[in-house]
């Protein structure tokens, strides 16, 4: 890729139907983990007009009212009126959970290669990524796409823009010059709204109250704004589209700036490496960049079901590393335990912490629950690499 280019990422709000499904799945996971931290959970959700379907595989000693959890999640998001197409009080909730297959459980409970550890819950490949485009070490486009829909939610909830409704989408196109974010080329923001508000009022409020307070002002000189481009967005949420768990995996991660292994996160307990290993790979990549070993870092790990140790740990810095990628990979293997149980212990994942992750991104957020965002191994990596002093930060 040329050093001068446009790159786009999108995000969606908590009221987007797929995110409603993700949040219900993770709320159920949290409710179970609060009682049984060793539960095996794969909670899938479908939501449509007036209907929620809960299915998947759960093995637990916990006693959870799944219907109540689903309704409370819908209420918290803001779907509390039948005019919105789904109302927490009156929607139908169907529950169809099975137990985890014993064939899978035997490989997870006792790894074939490591009797002191648990095996991976499935085969698969996972990626982690970090770069120095923002203080959070996230790609600029996805970071700000998240902040836009988060701002939409804040203004809806505090009543400053009372005509806003829960469903919204953002898209940020950034112009890169010499490989660094230079300016914001285009912002798309579509928000569900009350029927009586005019398009002109929506456009002015969205630009002045949502977009401009969020994006860096020095990057907006020639920005194009596309606000509700269809001209009307009254019908939204699960009424506008059927929502499913795990259908926003690029929104959940790096906005397309890094590869994705294909496995979704929400509703899965940390024995599922789709989730826990992706979190660990982000933790590794962020510490590599925070240590000043590279300006950007992509980490791939892969697993076989029932086997504890990763098949591979590969680091790629796209030529930005100050030491060879192979040397960074060796440091990662020495200082990070990427076996499933090692990840769980390293990041303290057997906690009911997942509800917050289900909207506005799993990465790049300074929340106390997000242990994978810590940079506590950066100095250790720097010293192990033989580098002196503190790393130089180079944010856009």
Curated annotation (Swiss-Prot):
It is found in: Cytoplasm. CDD domains: S-AdoMet_synt (cd18079). Mg(2+) binds at residue 18. Pathway: Amino-acid biosynthesis; S-adenosyl-L-methionine biosynthesis; S-adenosyl-L-methionine from L-methionine: step 1/1. Its EC number is 2.5.1.6. SUPFAM superfamilies: S-adenosylmethionine synthetase. Residues 100-110 are annotated as: Flexible loop. Catalyzes the formation of S-adenosylmethionine (AdoMet) from methionine and ATP. The overall synthetic reaction is composed of two sequential steps, AdoMet formation and the subsequent tripolyphosphate hydrolysis which occurs prior to release of AdoMet from the enzyme. PROSITE patterns: ADOMET_SYNTHASE_1, ADOMET_SYNTHASE_2. This is S-adenosylmethionine synthase. The gene is metK.
